[in-house]
From Swiss-Prot:
It comes from Xanthomonas euvesicatoria pv. vesicatoria (strain 85-10). The gene is atpH. Transmembrane segments: none annotated. The keyword Cell membrane applies. F-type ATPases have 2 components, F(1) - the catalytic core - and F(0) - the membrane proton channel. F(1) has five subunits: alpha(3), beta(3), gamma(1), delta(1), epsilon(1). F(0) has three main subunits: a(1), b(2) and c(10-14). The alpha and beta chains form an alternating ring which encloses part of the gamma chain. F(1) is attached to F(0) by a central stalk formed by the gamma and epsilon chains, while a peripheral stalk is formed by the delta and b chains. Pfam families: OSCP (PF00213). It is found in: Cell inner membrane. This is ATP synthase subunit delta. Its main location: membrane.
Length: 175
């Protein structure tokens, strides 16, 4: 996995530079997300390894219908280098660079039950105060947490779940 990220990093940076130059972050995000999802499918991944599949066919397969010329050239470069399988990692790196440029922290809040909008607003305000940036929250539900929530911003994980507290208590009692 770390090797894939290492190989994908220059392509993620290149995609970001092209999008920044054109001032069109959102279309590139959408296009990369589409291509990453298609490339991540095991059947498509196997097809991409088939030597009978030409570069143009691979680009056509992975490009969204609304893709611009710059994006098609970018996919062509990936195809030339036989790096189309790295599209999920490239898309992830691109999104990290975009969030940094737009001064946004992306956070995933996983809770034991669905949270109200008021609770999410409170968490967003606290995270904005802590990081000094706008916050883009994605929610998930995991009943195994028992109660509370886990907030993951990529670099920082705040585990306020009952499951996490019980695990920490068990660990401290064991030692």
């Amino acid at each position: 996995m770390s090797q894939a990220l290492t190989l994908a990093r220059p392509y993620g940076r290149a995609a970001f530079a092209i999008a920044r130059e054109g001032g069109n972050f959102a279309p590139w995000s959408d296009a990369l997300a589409f291509s990453a999802q298609v490339a991540g499918d095991p059947r498509v991944a196997a097809l991409l390894l088939n030597p009978a599949l030409g570069q143009e066919q691979a680009v056509t397969l992975l490009a969204p219908p609304q893709a611009g010329e710059d994006y098609l050239r970018f996919l062509g470069v990936l195809a030339d280098a036989q790096r189309l399988s790295l599209l999920p990692e490239v898309a992830g790196l691109y999104e990290q660079l975009r969030a940094e440029a737009e001064h946004v922290v992306k956070a995933t809040v996983t809770s034991a039950a669905a949270m109200s909008q008021t609770e999410l607003d409170t968490i967003a305000a606290a995270l904005k105060k802590r990081f000094g940036r706008d916050v883009d929250i994605t929610t998930a539900v995991d009943a195994s947490l028992i109660g509370g929530a886990v907030i993951d911003t990529g670099d920082v994980v705040i585990d306020g779940s009952l499951k996490g507290k019980l695990a920490r208590l068990q660990s401290s009692l064991a030692h």
